[in-house]
From Swiss-Prot:
Protein family: Belongs to the amino acid-polyamine-organocation (APC) superfamily. Amino acid transporter (AAT) (TC 2.A.3.1) family.
Cytoplasmic side: 1-19, 64-86, 139-155, 223-240, 293-333, 380-407, 451-457
Species in which this protein is naturally found: Escherichia coli O157:H7
Reactions the enzyme catalyzes: L-phenylalanine(in) + H(+)(in) = L-phenylalanine(out) + H(+)(out); L-tryptophan(in) + H(+)(in) = L-tryptophan(out) + H(+)(out); L-tyrosine(in) + H(+)(in) = L-tyrosine(out) + H(+)(out)
Protein name, UniProt field: Aromatic amino acid transport protein AroP
Gene field: aroP
């Protein structure tokens, strides 16, 4: 009985430094790069490389802000805890629930992408069927224990990293050995209408989709409560992940866009698979499709982990039903995994009803939730830093360029929202932000009223 109580509300610290680095890396190397980059290439051309560098810098600032807070206070629920403690109870409530919804939407987008990748081999299989099968498999794995999740995500991410590095090396060899055919040349980066064929506007208009690619880096913060040694592992993961991401994103896209003119890229297929398919290398195209499928499953796996831990943190704060604040004897928050899975299952229905537009719609909703998420991290960090300065505390892992870095991030978020308002198909998700904030407000008032009623009794 004592043992049951001891484990009743505690997550196990079963994640090592290698797990944490690859969870964050795996969270970012996914559908945004492998599938989302297609529409960016069509609009921005080779300028996509500059776009990823800009968004990568913003993502790094956000990660360092979150990293500073997490190293000081490694807790479940990550930044919703900081918003709650340093900003106010509504901020904690809103940021936590927004993050949970964000990752439910990301999970839906990744499952949709899985369906598209399966169609590369089996065009007759509807996306909703593939989504349903992998939905069941990944959730079943997450119901084991955190170390199994960590190991699986570690190997998923290793496959992605090796594949991206191998693709950069193999693509480079094709490029410089002359085996890539007459169209393979570094001059493709500026010959087809210039580096920015549609001007700087073409690139700016794509920043929202590029931002989608970097969503997932903040998973480092969520892992803190289950990290063996957060004071060492979080700073190391934060600093190393961003350099690797930029090398992978910028390196792979530079090689890719040199192998073939950017004008040949189509929106529905991964440009990585398409280019090797067009070069006539069916083996590499098939191998890469396995990799992009693994990438989507890896991010979905991270989503299942992340959603359940965020909901667990919300329940511990009293912002979600108390039943969700329990774990089984292995330290697995089974209830939160099942609740998150139930909502994510809507993805199968969306793919059944609107298979063609499902991915675009989900991606737009993800970016809106991500804007709220990153803005709240930046704002919560400013309040956290002020509180620490007033207490005379010198933090161990200070964020870069504080407070200027925070204002740069907030300006970037505002620009992304304006871009989305001007983008057909994306504007609806921006209009939904005030609606979503009202829903959160009603939920918060209901929670407060219920809490008061319980106290009165």
């Amino acid at each position: 009985m004592m043992e049951g109580q001891q484990h009743g509300e505690q997550l196990k610290r079963g994640l090592k430094n290698r797990h944490i680095q690859l969870i964050a890396l795996g969270g970012a190397i996914g559908t945004g790069l492998f599938l989302g980059s297609a529409s960016v290439i069509q609009s921005a051309g080779p300028g996509i490389i500059l776009g990823y560098a800009i968004a990568g810098f913003i993502a790094f600032l956000i990660m360092r802000q979150l990293g500073e807070m997490v190293v000081e206070e490694p807790v479940a629920g990550s930044f919703s805890h900081f918003a709650y403690k340093y900003w106010g109870s509504f901020a904690g409530f809103a940021s936590g629930w927004n993050y949970w919804v964000l990752y439910v939407l990301v999970a839906m987008a990744e499952l949709t992408a899985v369906g598209k990748y399966i169609q590369f081999w089996y065009p007759e299989i509807p996306t909703w069927v593939s989504a349903a099968v992998f939905f069941v498999v990944i959730n079943a794995i997450n119901l084991t224990n955190v170390t199994v999740f960590g190991e699986m995500e570690f190997w998923f991410a290793i496959i992605k990293v090796i594949a991206v590095v191998a693709m950069i090396i193999f693509g480079g060899w094709l490029l410089f050995s002359g085996n890539g055919g007459p169209q393979a040349s570094v001059s493709n980066l500026w010959d087809q209408g210039g580096f920015l064929p549609h001007g700087f506007t073409g690139l700016v208009m794509m920043m929202a989709i590029i931002m989608f690619s970097f969503g997932g880096l903040e998973l480092v913060g969520i892992t803190a409560a289950e990290a063996d040694n957060p004071e060492q592992s979080i700073p190391k993961a934060t600093n190393q992940v961003i350099y690797r991401i930029l090398i992978f994103y910028i390196g792979s896209l530079a090689v890719l866009l040199s192998l073939m003119p950017w004008t040949r890229v189509t929106a529905d297929t991964s440009p990585f698979v398409l280019i090797f398919h067009e070069l006539g290398d069916t083996f590499v195209a098939n191998a890469l499709n396995i990799v992009v499928l693994t990438a989507a499953l890896s991010v979905y796996n991270s989503c299942v982990y992340c959603n359940s831990r965020m909901l667990f943190g919300l329940a511990q704060q009293g912002n979600a039903p108390k039943a969700l604040a329990s774990v089984d004897k292995r330290g697995v928050p089974v209830n939160t995994i099942l609740v998150s899975a139930l909502v994510t299952a809507l993805c199968v229905l969306i793919n059944y009803l609107a298979p063609e537009s499902a991915f675009g719609l989900l991606m737009a909703l993800v970016v809106s939730a991500l804007v709220i998420n990153w803005a709240m991290i930046s704002l919560a960090h400013m309040k956290f830093r002020r509180a620490k300065q007033e207490q005379g505390v010198v933090t161990r892992f200070p964020a870069l360029l504080y407070p200027l870095g925070n204002w740069i991030c907030l300006l970037f978020m505002a620009v992304v929202l304006v871009i989305m308002l001007m983008t057909p198909g994306m504007a609806i998700s921006v209009y939904l932000i005030p609606v979503w904030l009202v829903v959160l407000g009603i939920g918060y008032l209901f929670k407060e009223k219920t809490a008061k009623a319980v106290k009165a009794h």
